[in-house]
Design a protein with these regions (language model features):
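A short helix->beta-strand "capping" segment at the edge of beta-propeller domains
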Residues: 72-95, 125-131
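Beta-strand-rich domains and repeat architectures in extracellular enzymes and scaffolds
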Residues: 87-119, 134-146, 295-297
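Beta-rich, blade/repeat-based domains predominating
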Residues: 94-105, 138-148, 178-191, 221-235, ...
Length: 303
């Protein structure tokens, strides 16, 4: 009952990548192929102003005028458009203002936002029961999260500070700094990947937590901003687009949007409460190839 998303092998539009202390060859390898996703749904700040709208400009050299007729080149391949099939749904705290969602070893780890309400929690999927929770300082607006090497990394909205927690105890064991806002956070084998509400993805070295590169995300030559909660799935970055029902599938090397997942209608009108807000929260179970999504104050997480 999974959805098969087929990615185009052509039509890539290479973007310049700004690097600090590294080359483009070792920054990231672009991945294309077949992505099989089963969708299961459940982060970034509620009353956030629109952030930078970084439209990319690209220059294409004009070919010389041919002296003899030639066959026109094939049209550029645009991003794939995908819908969804609900495989399962699980209870979700309807008061949780979801900012980040991660699946690990049979549990959901979730960060929630808003001043005075931000938390880090571990949740039992089948019941929605909160097994472990820690509150964040009332003066801090919590944002997205990622887990690696037995640690939970969390960013904050406007404090320019991230927190590091022990995965088992939820004890805070460190902090890290970054300029500007923090919205979403994901990780792959090499990097932590940070969004800030603009069209930029920043890549952080997980050892030093310093930025080592960034890409501009674009579709049809224009920047795609409002990048919010992130998840890395089969070589692609998935990003909630804030205040929409769509998830962008992004090539991590070029920044090109290779697909759009339209989740409009996922949460039925009768399932919405007076405080229900936007789609936000993506988690991936790599062992079983399952994708989960939810939203801010949604009553369910969908697979």
């Amino acid at each position: 009952q999974a959805i098969t998303l087929r990615l185009s092998h052509s039509g890539y539009h290479t973007q310049a990548i700004t690097h600090v202390g590294m080359t483009a060859q070792n920054f990231f390898s672009g991945v294309v192929g077949t992505l099989i996703v089963g969708l299961f749904l459940a982060s970034c700040g509620g009353d956030k102003p629109t952030e930078r709208n970084g439209n990319d400009t690209t220059t294409t050299a004009s070919p010389a005028t041919p002296t003899t007729p030639s066959v026109p080149p094939p049209a550029a391949v645009g991003p794939e458009e995908f819908t969804f099939e609900v495989v399962n749904k699980f209870p979700h705290d309807p008061k949780a203002y979801t900012q980040g969602l991660v699946w690990l070893d049979g549990f959901f780890y979730e960060t929630t936002g808003l001043y005075g309400e931000s938390t880090l929690r571990k949740v039992e999927p089948t019941t929605g029961k909160i097994l472990q929770k820690v509150a964040i300082d009332r003066e801090i607006f919590g944002e997205g999260m990622a887990i690696r090497d037995g640690k939970i990394f969390q960013v904050t909205w406007r404090n320019e500070t991230g927190f590091i927690y022990d995965l088992n105890t939820f004890s805070q064991i460190g902090t890290f700094q970054y300029p500007g806002e923090g919205w979403g956070l994901a990780q792959n084998d090499q990097y932590l990947i940070l969004s800030d509400g603009s069209n930029i993805l920043r890549y952080l070295d997980p050892s030093t937590l310093r930025e080592v590169g960034r890409v501009n995300v674009f579709d049809a030559g224009s920047g795609v901003d409002q990048l919010n909660e992130l998840e890395f799935v089969n070589g692609k970055v998935l990003a909630n687009i804030y205040q929409t029902d769509r998830i962008a599938q992004i090539d991590p090397y070029s920044g090109k949007v290779t697909g759009w997942i339209n989740l409009g209608g996922l949460l039925k009108p009768e399932e919405r409460g007076p405080d229900t807000e936007v789609l936000n929260g993506i988690a991936y179970d790599a062992k079983s190839d399952r994708l989960f999504v939810t939203g801010k104050r949604w009553p369910f997480v969908f697979e």
